[in-house]
């Protein structure tokens, strides 16, 4: 295994080759269809070249291009990971990581090892990022005992040219990049395995915290707090439509906004003030005070980075970041093109650089020269990367600009085509001239020193906007920020030809409109990713995971494509901010990302980077465990909500399923209610009655409630009556089994038996639960038909679920697979019928095998005909 530590990373093309370089001519000569392999790789004899990639799709694409002289195997992601059962980071031994072969990956590793034994040389072509470098390192460590040449190749585009370039410039595994990945893994594991148990103990089981995800949740919570604290301010605007006096054309009318009142900036704060201004303007005469025109330019955006791709996917298509990356991954790894096979359509999609390779720029210029000659600049535009950017890869671009979105419309599905068009268009536009337009500003002055302002623009040259098919003033919309635009195409109208000193006439009365200042908008995926990027939190490759995690953990929820913190998210955020100020500090988290970058650059060693984080975190963790973090499980918050049963004010408590309301008169009154979020804040859940459903035990109405296993029916007289049953019922509604008036009491304590509902249906339980945990099957009221047996048919549970059998088991072993229904068989006279699925529908059948009776289709199993 060949590895190296370099003072700084070099571009992939400039890495020093360590022998075994394969020429482009060799690749071209071997591009023919290979034999079968588990990943689509060739089956050439011993002494060939083995290439190991991450995904089977990528393996098949490489196989198609390279042919049978190369065997390609896929690792299917990471082969090694930290153990799930323990933290796996030894803080006393320089943070040594305990990697082990992941569950289910031993077979994959054995296949790779077997293929490597018969290979002359091995190329590790996992993705060109930190995760890919770690995968290559772990594979190399497992194959090192074979004493074969192992080289690292970086494939930035899955095309014949891109693969040939990678194989002609093999390098070594970059241990600095591996250490950076290890450091990130160590930090995330330390935080997750330290904080999650603490949250389980103080809040509820199943919660988690993360080094970056928790900061993302904090941003959402902080924004919600800003919105709640925001006090709107009223203001008014006045618009007036004018028309040149000497013009007779209706098209010469234009709209202007009141800009100044008596020479001072127009600030109108109430309806009374607005009315006074309208009265002031009513008799005023106006003329054109000034006309100014300036040429403006709208620059094209740089080529796409990972974060901008995710933002644009969210803004334009409402795609979650995860979906955008999944679609881009498919475009990179290869799509089936008729006559060409699997073809990589874009370059590697995880990058924070806006740089383009010279050959890519020339490819774009050639396309622009042929299709948009007026938009071709004299030289290729260059874009500056942000400070601290890792410039290892190009920006995201198409591998062949001549594969236009139109040419692939019949090949790609809708999502693939939309993302490809976004990438293709961004690439071409970035290499074109800016759009030029003439912006005109007109000041309309009144005879009382009041003035209106109007602006308009006229397209001079569409430049890069020509790619969108935009022409004229429609293409000249202002370059608003993405948050302001929200996907709209608003534009400023072109003004008529006006001259200074020309008199104008007001058409109709002015239009006064009331407005209120708005709070900052809630984050959507695009704006939250942009905020994380601007603050230096996380890296492009992690944003999609962050978005998914905070939603899956139920710390935030989406409403109308915006992030709202849940009550759980707000609660956990408050606890973490109070107990772990460094961990939840935005600047501290950004600084740790810079430290990981420094490890990758070779400017800092792994141990120091992890130690810089662990020392302050360990101190905060000790204080939190020692009582610094509030134990919500032991805390009750008073509310002003009365108990619906006894009227006592309820208190807010935390249980294993989250926050809930409990009667303050506990244990005398054991009433509880779930909490739901409303516009006015948390409120008790309103439990609807189930129409027509009555309790079998006491006759009171049944209501719908929620538990661990979903909704169920419970008696409205709870806790006096604890009867429950499943809801909604599975299959056709069956009436509840009437309980006999002489139902025997609990055989253990003498208490009453009540109907309850569990995972496997209804059953009888002692009303004194949990003091008495006696249970019995729910009686069906149907006697066993075996001669001489006085048992009753009752539900029982086996390996395959619920079945019905005699209550005298094991003396009587008679069983039935379906629920018995107290209706005699009209064919043979058997005492009851049985429910059975026939053709996917629930039907009534005779349980006697020799009878074969089936009730007519559509007949309700629970109702006699």
Functional labels for PLM-detected ranges:
Residues 281-302, 307, 313, 513:
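Pre-Walker A segment
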Residues 56-59, 76-81, 128-132, 156-161, ...:
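Conserved nucleotide-binding/hydrolysis micro-motifs of P-loop NTPases
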Residues 2-42, 46-50, 60-63, 68, ...:
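Basic, low-complexity terminal or inter-domain segments flanking catalytic cores
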Residues 308-320, 529-539:
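Short helix-coil junctions and helix-kink-helix linkers
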Residues 184-194, 212, 242, 296-308, ...:
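Core structural elements
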């Amino acid at each position: 295994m060949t590895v190296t530590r370099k003072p700084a990373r070099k571009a992939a093309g400039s890495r020093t080759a360590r022998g075994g370089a394969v020429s482009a001519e060799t690749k071209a000569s071997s591009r023919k269809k290979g034999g079968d392999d588990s990943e689509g790789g060739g089956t050439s004899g011993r002494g060939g070249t083995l290439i190991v990639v991450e995904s089977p799709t990528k393996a098949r694409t490489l196989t198609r291009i390279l042919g049978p002289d190369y065997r390609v195997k896929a690792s299917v992601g990471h082969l090694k990971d930290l153990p799930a059962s323990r933290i796996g980071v030894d803080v006393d031994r320089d943070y040594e990581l305990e990697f082990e072969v992941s569950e289910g990956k031993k077979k994959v590793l054995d296949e790779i090892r077997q293929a490597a034994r018969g290979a002359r040389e091995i190329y590790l072509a996992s993705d060109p990022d930190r995760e890919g470098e770690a995968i290559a390192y772990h594979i190399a460590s497992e194959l090192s005992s074979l004493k074969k040449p192992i080289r690292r190749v970086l494939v930035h585009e899955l095309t014949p040219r891109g693969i040939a370039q990678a194989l002609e410039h093999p390098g070594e595994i970059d241990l600095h990049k591996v250490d950076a990945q290890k450091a990130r893994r160590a930090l995330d594991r330390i935080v997750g395995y330290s904080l999650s148990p603490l949250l389980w103990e103080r809040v509820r089981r199943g919660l988690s915290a993360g080094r970056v995800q928790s900061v993302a949740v904090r941003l959402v919570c902080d924004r919600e707090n800003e919105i709640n604290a925001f006090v709107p301010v009223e203001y008014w605007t006045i618009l007036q439509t004018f028309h040149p006096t000497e013009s007779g054309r209706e098209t010469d009318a234009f709209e202007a906004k009141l800009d100044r009142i008596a020479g001072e900036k127009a600030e109108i704060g109430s309806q009374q003030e607005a009315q006074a201004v309208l009265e002031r303007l009513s008799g005023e005469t106006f003329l054109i005070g000034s006309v100014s025109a300036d040429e403006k330019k709208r620059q094209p955006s740089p080529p796409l980075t990972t974060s901008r791709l995710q933002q644009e996917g969210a803004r334009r298509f409402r795609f979650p970041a995860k979906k955008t990356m999944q679609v881009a991954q498919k475009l990179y790894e290869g799509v089936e093109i008729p006559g060409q096979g699997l073809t990589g359509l874009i370059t590697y999609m995880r990058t924070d650089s806006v740089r383009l390779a010279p050959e890519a720029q020339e490819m774009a210029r050639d396309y622009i020269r042929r299709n948009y000659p007026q938009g071709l600049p004299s030289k290729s535009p260059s874009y500056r990367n942000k400070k601290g950017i890792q410039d290892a890869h190009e920006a995201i671009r198409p591998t062949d600009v001549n594969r236009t979105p139109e040419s692939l419309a019949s090949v790609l599905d809708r999502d693939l085509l939309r993302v490809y068009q976004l990438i293709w268009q961004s690439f071409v536009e970035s290499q074109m001239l800016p759009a030029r337009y003439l912006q005109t500003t007109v000041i309309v002055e009144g005879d009382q020193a009041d003035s209106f302002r109007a602006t308009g623009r006229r397209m001079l040259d569409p430049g890069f906007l020509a790619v969108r098919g935009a022409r004229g003033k429609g293409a000249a919309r202002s370059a608003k920020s993405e948050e302001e635009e929200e996907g709209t195409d608003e534009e400023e109208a072109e003004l008529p030809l006006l001259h200074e000193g020309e008199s104008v006439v007001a058409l109709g009365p002015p239009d006064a409109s009331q407005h209120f200042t708005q709070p900052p908008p809630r984050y959507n995926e695009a704006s939250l990713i942009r905020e994380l990027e601007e603050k230096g939190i996380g890296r492009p490759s992690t944003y999609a995971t962050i978005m998914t995690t905070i939603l899956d953990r139920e710390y935030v929820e989406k409403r109308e494509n915006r992030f709202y913190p849940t009550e759980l998210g707000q609660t956990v955020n408050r606890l973490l901010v109070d107990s772990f100020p460094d961990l939840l500090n935005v600047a501290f988290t950004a600084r740790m990302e810079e430290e990981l970058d420094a490890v990758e650059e070779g400017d800092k060693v792994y141990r120091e980077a992890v130690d810089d984080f662990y020392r302050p975190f360990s101190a905060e963790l000790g204080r939190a465990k020692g009582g610094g973090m509030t134990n919500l499980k032991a805390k009750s918050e008073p509310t002003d909500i009365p108990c619906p049963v006894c009227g006592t004010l309820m208190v807010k408590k935390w249980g294993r399923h989250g926050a809930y309301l409990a009667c303050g008169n506990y244990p005398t009154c054991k009433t509880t209610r779930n909490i739901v979020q409303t516009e006015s804040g948390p409120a008790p859940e309103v439990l609807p009655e189930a129409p027509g459903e009555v309790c079998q035990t006491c006759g009171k109405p049944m209501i719908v409630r929620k538990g661990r296993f979903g909704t169920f029916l419970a008696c409205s007289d709870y806790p006096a009556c604890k009867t429950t049953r499943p809801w909604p019922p599975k299959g056709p509604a069956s009436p509840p089994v009437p309980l006999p008036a002489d139902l025997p009491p609990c055989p253990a304590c003498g208490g009453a038996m009540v109907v309850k509902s569990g995972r496997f249906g209804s059953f009888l339980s002692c009303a004194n639960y949990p003091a008495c945990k006696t249970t019995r099957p729910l009686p069906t009221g149907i006697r066993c038909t075996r001669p001489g047996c006085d048992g009753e048919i009752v539900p029982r549970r086996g390996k395959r679920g619920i079945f019905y059998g005699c209550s005298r088991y094991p003396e009587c072993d008679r069983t039935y697979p379906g629920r018995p229904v107290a209706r005699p068989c009209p064919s043979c006279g058997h005492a009851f019928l049985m429910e059975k699925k026939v053709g996917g529908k629930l039907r009534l059948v005779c349980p006697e095998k020799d009878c074969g009776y089936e009730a007519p289709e559509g007949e309700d199993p629970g109702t006699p005909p």
